[in-house]
Amino acid sequence: MSEAEIKDKVYDIIVSKMGVNKDQIKPESKFSDDLGADSLDTVELIMELENEFGVQIPDEDAEKISTVQQAIDYIVKK
């Protein structure tokens, strides 16, 4: 899967889980500050990314993922 395909899927997951418009999402968008996620939203988002991409994201790594681009980069590396 290409990085562009991963980006599109990540954006789609954010739209469905967080109820934001796709045009509100930017690579530098922070889940909490820019997209209005609380800690539970972030946990659910990480779980959905794990399910969608078949990766395990340990808690210590999940804590470091705070922006859209960090999520994309993490998945690309896996």
Swiss-Prot record:
Pathway: Lipid metabolism; fatty acid biosynthesis. Residues 4-78 form the Carrier domain. 4'-phosphopantetheine is transferred from CoA to a specific serine of apo-ACP by AcpS. This modification is essential for activity because fatty acids are bound in thioester linkage to the sulfhydryl of the prosthetic group. Keywords: Cytoplasm, Fatty acid biosynthesis, Fatty acid metabolism, Lipid biosynthesis, Lipid metabolism, Phosphopantetheine, Phosphoprotein. It comes from the Bacteria. GO terms for cellular component: cytosol; membrane. Gene3D superfamilies: ACP-like. GO terms for molecular function: acyl binding; acyl carrier activity. GO terms for biological process: lipid A biosynthetic process. InterPro entries: ACP (IPR003231), ACP-like_sf (IPR036736), PP-bd_ACP (IPR009081), Ppantetheine_attach_site (IPR006162). The modification O-(pantetheine 4'-phosphoryl)serine is found at S39. It is found in: Cytoplasm. Belongs to the acyl carrier protein (ACP) family. HAMAP family: Acyl_carrier. Carrier of the growing fatty acid chain in fatty acid biosynthesis. This is Acyl carrier protein.
